[in-house]
């Protein structure tokens, strides 16, 4: 008998709760009438990947793409004469299954982090053996080496930083880093 009384009390409580929420549920209507969930905002510096095939092997660079957004970049956000992570967020990563020559630098097959040393003229590309970095601070003493880059001025400001491979040949290419009005580049070739 006690069990029947408890069940009756629970059923009455459930019915009361349901009747109290019925008007609210009725106002909600169909799920299709409900507003859409907010969409995620795009990342301010989204990730990017660029690849090139040299001698039948794929060289890959992973980086993040910061934007100018009205800021002075070279000599401002990216100060001269200080090592820069060359992108945003995680460090820029080079993956090569073959030995390369980047500028004057011999780079064995492997995974590396790319940094740059910007100046008002000739930059240096830094290939670091330390990987898995966020991008800053720069890991002093982990350089595989540094090589000079060449400089071209872009005819118009480029809003979003990019890394690209240009002038692609079967066994060589140029690595270009472009942002604002700066185009820094270096030749990359499959090592012989």
Q: Where in the sequence are the language-model features?
A:
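Mid-length scaffold segments of soluble, non-membrane domains
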Residues: 83-137
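Generic structural signal for beta-strand residues in well-ordered domains
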Residues: 17-19, 105, 168
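Primarily secretory-pathway and cell-envelope proteins
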Residues: 27-77, 82, 131-192
């Amino acid at each position: 008998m006690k069990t029947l009384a408890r069940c009756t009390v629970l059923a009455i409580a459930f019915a009361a709760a349901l009747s109290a929420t019925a008007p609210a549920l009725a106002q909600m209507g169909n799920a299709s009438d409900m507003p859409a969930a907010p969409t995620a905002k795009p990342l301010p510096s989204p990730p990017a990947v660029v690849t090139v095939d040299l001698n039948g092997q794929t060289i890959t660079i992973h980086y993040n793409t910061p934007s100018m957004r009205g800021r002075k970049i070279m000599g401002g956000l990216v100060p001269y004469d200080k090592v820069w992570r060359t992108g945003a967020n995680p460090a820029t990563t080079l993956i090569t299954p073959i030995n390369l020559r980047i500028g004057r630098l011999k780079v064995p097959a492997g995974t590396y982090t790319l940094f740059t040393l910007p100046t008002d003229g000739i930059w240096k590309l830094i290939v670091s053996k330390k990987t898995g970095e966020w991008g800053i601070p720069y890991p002093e003493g982990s350089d595989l080496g540094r090589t000079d880059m060449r400089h071209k001025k872009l005819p118009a400001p480029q809003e979003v930083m990019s890394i690209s491979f240009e002038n692609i040949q079967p066994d060589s290419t140029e690595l270009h880093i472009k942002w604002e009005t700066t185009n820094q580049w270096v030749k990359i070739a499959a090592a012989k």
